[in-house]
């Protein structure tokens, strides 16, 4: 007999809207046995009617992540095969249109596979398995990837803090095939990018900023560009190809800046007009302000400032401060491309924070474009939490 999770009265409403999370405080009782981490359980409303089938996670606040809302759909190898095929089909047009050899194949809940992220970099598939359900089905997931992508190596980068909330330890390593020498070279919009899936951030690279890199290129011809938190310099790379007069790439990582240099080289771009500055962005911006240095275009792509609600107020202060200083460094009519990758930072709140920064900077600001994650990072209508990357293009007077 299947284990049944009965919800408290009224807690079925979010599931009836197909939201895939059930929190521990919404559970009335567990019937039919004691589920182990990752086990598939049936979820029913307080009156007993069936709602969904999901993975049990006893140590997480999110105690069930729903795999399916279809009562006839079983969770087995065919289930994962179908989900992977559907995700690939949904990206095929984009891949052809933009000439992509690097893209997000599986975007977790937004692709109906909670806790599973898979990125493709040429012939390497990089997985992050971040939930007990994903962990339980690890071998099956890898088997299906090998069947559908027989020419690809499969590498795991489940080395993120969120696994701790599930009671899971970090896991990194090769799951199938042979890993090519690093870096892997991917291509997007005719630009080649070096990616180190072993030592790089996340799964190796920030695929979600692809459309925003192209957006930035519209504003840079003949301009001076300051690229903050540049990582491997790809905003600067797009700027160089688009004819920027000068580019300064700033990051704290020596390795990232070396890769930024390599990216220029593999695209046969001269970098005589590019400065690679290993520095703390927060300190450097203040230094440049004190020195009276200015730029025509500034890109602000900082790391996440808020991991939970208790950090949101502090994050707002951090975003306001850094945007204020950046505005003070822009020439009149200059362009600020500013981002937040904190899922808790709603787009309206982010715009308000940047508007407040403009007041403190004593600059007039016009918002001329909104930016978000690339379309291979879809947002399910039932899972608004999947909308995490927000950006604004602002003209600063």
From Swiss-Prot:
Its main location: cytoplasm. It holds the Pfam family Methyltrans_SAM. Residues 2-80 form the PUA domain. Keywords: Cytoplasm, Methyltransferase, RNA-binding, rRNA processing, S-adenosyl-L-methionine, Transferase. It catalyses: cytidine(1962) in 23S rRNA + S-adenosyl-L-methionine = 5-methylcytidine(1962) in 23S rRNA + S-adenosyl-L-homocysteine + H(+). InterPro entries: PUA (IPR002478), PUA-like_sf (IPR015947), PUA_sf (IPR036974), RLMI (IPR023542), RlmI-like_PUA (IPR041532), SAM-dep_methyl-trfase (IPR019614), SAM-dependent_MTases_sf (IPR029063). One of its GO terms (molecular function) is rRNA (cytosine) methyltransferase activity. It is found in: Cytoplasm. Its EC number is 2.1.1.191. Disulfide bonds: none annotated. It is an enzyme of class 2 (transferase). One of its GO terms (cellular component) is cytoplasm. Belongs to the methyltransferase superfamily. RlmI family. Specifically methylates the cytosine at position 1962 (m5C1962) of 23S rRNA. This is Ribosomal RNA large subunit methyltransferase I. It comes from Shewanella frigidimarina (strain NCIMB 400).
